[in-house]
A protein has these predicted regions:
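Conserved "right-hand" nucleotidyltransferase catalytic core of DNA-directed polymerases
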Residues: 5, 9-28, 39, 46-48, ...
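Active-site-proximal helix-loop-helix substrate-binding element of RNase H-like nuclease domains
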Residues: 42-203, 358-359, 366, 370-372
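Short, conserved, GDST-rich strand-edge loop motifs in beta-rich repeat architectures
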Residues: 32-35
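Cytochrome P450 core scaffold surrounding the K-helix E-X-X-R motif
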Residues: 25-29, 58-61
């Protein structure tokens, strides 16, 4: 593709800027990068690159063009710096693509039993921008730096058109829309041009070796992921559904309300019982529980437990877990741009409830077995057990 690069020139290569466009039926935002790339219909459509600050060239993989051998060598050579904006996306996606196509290149470029390209040798201008106090998105960084060439605005619509499946599950074919496809190729090329300008403008503020070491560690943590006990997750979600069904049925029996989950209906019922309250938030319910008894107190306790019966984290685990039951890509390096602290994605592993159950291993095993009756018998609150 483009000019021929001779082997002597390849040996002198020190840097390569690149950007890819991909497709997958998995929702990237909700299920994460690793699950996105693991999808059977995942593919790399376009790859644009520039060698050592040279001219940007596009490889139209969707229309049968192939990645040159020298580029595969570069991508799998830890001594060649691969520069991209949000480089983890390019690295993980290219890891999957090269493995699928059996284009493995240099063995030194792989780790984790050949699952991923090593993060050593990868450089992320998104992280570089964040450390400099700039926004993280390519578009926002370009605008903040007043770059000569900005990210093309048509890209968002074209990504939706070519990279996200239609309602029937199929993808639009580039060959059916040649003009739009050419625009998409130009968009891909422009992204590399914008990234190169960012890299050049921030040359005086490079990531230090110290920070690069942390970045590599972060990438390795994300690649290895954490093991998810999918049986426990599945049964926890089922237990929560059973608890909610029983609790709502009991609440209907107590109040006679059509929807005892409605704050307005419950407040009206409480007033009929001679109990006035402006709210049913956590603090208000706790205060009412100290001054009520009988059916009112039972209803408030049910209300309190229903408010705790959230299994969003379990549902997130279910969505993110890969085929090997590991959840990957849970940490965003330099996610808090003002402090440089990491942030979490998808499951929010840094924000799990504190454990207060003394025999937690037993409770965990009962949930894993799906033994709802035992959990209900042995513990005060099913939702509280599930939250821990």
């Amino acid at each position: 593709v483009g000019r021929v690069i001779h082997r002597t020139e390849v040996k002198q290569m020190t840097e390569i800027h690149f950007d890819i466009e991909t497709k997958s039926s998995v929702d990237l935002a909700k299920q994460g990068l690793y699950k996105y790339a693991e999808s059977p219909d995942f593919d790399v459509l376009l790859l644009s690159y520039a060698v050592d600050n040279g001219k940007v060239q596009a490889i139209d993989l969707a229309n049968g063009e192939v990645i040159p051998a020298f580029l595969i060598d570069a991508l799998t050579n830890p001594n060649v710096r691969k520069i991209a904006h949000n480089a983890s996306f390019e690295r993980v996606c290219m890891s999957v693509y090269l493995r699928k196509k059996r284009l493995l290149g240099n063995a030194d470029g792989w780790y984790s039993d050949g699952k991923f390209l090593t993060p050593v040798g990868w450089y992320c201008t998104m992280i570089q921008a964040a450390e400099a106090g700039l926004p993280m998105s390519l578009k926002a960084v370009g605008e903040a730096l007043h770059l000569k060439e900005q990210k093309l605005s048509e890209g968002k619509e074209l990504i939706q058109f070519f990279c996200v499946p239609k309602k029937d599950g199929t993808f639009n074919k580039p060959s059916d829309f040649p003009e739009r496809w050419e625009t998409f190729k130009n968009y891909n090329i422009r992204d590399v041009q914008v990234e190169m300008q960012i890299y050049q403008q921030l040359a005086k503020l490079p990531l230090s070796q110290y920070e690069m070491g942390h970045y590599i560690t972060d990438q390795m943590i994300n690649d290895y992921g954490i093991c998810i006990d999918t049986q426990l997750v599945q049964n926890a979600i089922a237990m929560n559904a059973k608890f909610r069904e029983q609790a709502l049925q009991r609440a209907k029996e107590i109040t006679g309300l059509d929807n005892p989950n409605s704050p307005l209906q419950v407040l009206g019922w409480l007033e009929e019982q001679g109990v006035k309250s402006a709210s049913l938030d956590k603090e208000a319910v706790a205060e009412l529980l100290r001054t009520t008894d009988g059916s009112v107190k039972e209803m408030l306790l049910l209300r309190q437990q229903l408010s705790k019966s959230s299994v969003k984290k379990y549902e997130a685990m279910q969505k993110v877990a890969a085929s090997d039951d590991r959840a990957r890509g849970l940490i965003q390096f330099y996610g808090a741009t003002k402090t440089g602290r990491f942030s979490s994605k998808l499951i929010q592993v840094q924000n799990l409830p504190r454990n207060a159950i003394s025999d937690l291993p037993i409770a965990r095993e009962l949930v894993k077995e799906g033994n709802y009756e035992a959990v209900e018998l042995l513990y005060d609150s099913v939702p509280d057990v599930l939250s821990q």
